[in-house]
């Protein structure tokens, strides 16, 4: 009997896209269900009663929540193709450390870039660039955070890469002069087939970002 794989998601989400990419890296057939986050479906509330957030992967009726937890689950269940996490325990621990850094240090300033203006937005841009510079140092001269292989940290970052262009246009700043090596890796990731299949057009993301700003009266 074939696995039933359902993904509850929201198209512009930098977190939901991680699950989409991981599934496509593994060649897993799945049913995509778009969620209205202002009117969440009974299935989402049932499958993620604690946080009530996307993405939720439902595998044979069992839910897995939180984006990078979902990615790790996908890697472990469909382990015969394109490993996402390294096999070495130390390298796995390091990958998890940097993913935690990504979501701890990037999310809040990124959110403020989209939702604020003036001095608050300027502070957010500085914090964002500072965190990206630390990530660029960790990346070094490698093509990917996983070395020669697209992996766990790259998937986490691709959610943010997908919003780089919109963030730059919204807040009138440029990431590449500050982080050229990171941007080169970002462009490499964004050209990957699993990523291209999982992302929407940057202009559509920008239009959505302007809607967010209107909601917050910015």
Curated annotation (Swiss-Prot):
Enzyme nomenclature, EC number: 2.5.1.18
GO molecular function, one term: glutathione transferase activity
SUPFAM superfamilies cross-referenced by the UniProt entry: GST C-terminal domain-like (SSF47616), Thioredoxin-like (SSF52833)
InterPro entries for the chain: Glutathione-S-Trfase_C-like, Glutathione-S-Trfase_C_sf, Glutathione_S-Trfase, Glutathione_S-Trfase_N, GST_C, GST_C_Tau, Omega/Tau-like, Thioredoxin-like_sf
Transmembrane stretches, start-end: none
Record field: catalytic activity: RX + glutathione = an S-substituted glutathione + a halide anion + H(+)
PTM-bearing positions, type N-acetylalanine: 2
Residue numbers binding glutathione: 13-14, 39-40, 53-54, 66-67
GO BP terms, alphabetized: glutathione metabolic process; toxin catabolic process
Similarity comment text for this entry: Belongs to the GST superfamily. Tau family.
Entry-linked PANTHER family: GLUTATHIONE S-TRANSFERASE U22, GLUTATHIONE S-TRANSFERASE, GST, SUPERFAMILY, GST DOMAIN CONTAINING
Biological role: May be involved in the conjugation of reduced glutathione to a wide number of exogenous and endogenous hydrophobic electrophiles and have a detoxification role against certain herbicides.
Protein name (Swiss-Prot/TrEMBL): Glutathione S-transferase U22
Lineage, highest ranks first: Eukaryota, Viridiplantae, Streptophyta, Embryophyta, Tracheophyta
